[in-house]
UniProtKB/Swiss-Prot annotation:
InterPro entries from the UniProt entry: CRISPR_associated_Cas2, Virulence_VapD/CRISPR_Cas2
Protein name: CRISPR-associated endoribonuclease Cas2
HAMAP family: Cas2 (MF_01471)
Subunit-structure text: Homodimer, forms a heterotetramer with a Cas1 homodimer.
CDD domains, sorted: Cas2_I_II_III (cd09725)
Function as written in the Swiss-Prot or TrEMBL entry: CRISPR (clustered regularly interspaced short palindromic repeat), is an adaptive immune system that provides protection against mobile genetic elements (viruses, transposable elements and conjugative plasmids). CRISPR clusters contain sequences complementary to antecedent mobile elements and target invading nucleic acids. CRISPR clusters are transcribed and processed into CRISPR RNA (crRNA). Functions as a ssRNA-specific endoribonuclease. Involved in the integration of spacer DNA into the CRISPR cassette.
Organism listed in the record: Allochromatium vinosum (strain ATCC 17899 / DSM 180 / NBRC 103801 / NCIMB 10441 / D)
GO MF assignments: metal ion binding; RNA endonuclease activity
The organism's place on the tree of life at top rank: Bacteria
GO terms (BP aspect): defense response to virus; maintenance of CRISPR repeat elements
Record-annotated membrane-spanning stretches: none
Keywords assigned: Antiviral defense, Endonuclease, Hydrolase, Magnesium, Metal-binding, Nuclease, Plasmid
Length: 94
């Protein structure tokens, strides 16, 4: 099974759970910020990560997002930033 680029993002209220999510995703990520992480994973790894971290969240207060990055899909953006397609599925967001 081949690995693909994926994005994991979260909004977690509890500091302990948030720190654990950050520590876990830093082991997998290629790049990212505090709550948004680009990771190179296969489908099994993605499912395990999503379920592992999702089990710790409080659905009443927290949010957890996973998506595959698909180069052939349109990119939607909203707000002050801008996006520019560079080449071969690369995207510049500023």
């Amino acid at each position: 099974m081949s690995s693909r680029l994926a994005v994991f993002a979260y909004d977690i209220r509890d500091d302990r759970v948030r720190r654990h999510a950050l520590k876990t995703l830093r082991e997998w990520r290629l790049d990212g910020q505090l709550s948004v992480h680009e990771c190179q994973v296969d489908a099994i790894q993605a499912r395990r990560l999503f379920e592992q971290l999702g089990d710790e969240l409080d659905p009443a207060t927290d949010a957890w997002l996973f998506t595959w990055v698909e180069g052939h899909r349109a990119v939607l953006a909203r707000g002050k930033g801008r996006t520019t397609a560079l080449q071969d599925g690369l995207l510049l967001a500023a």
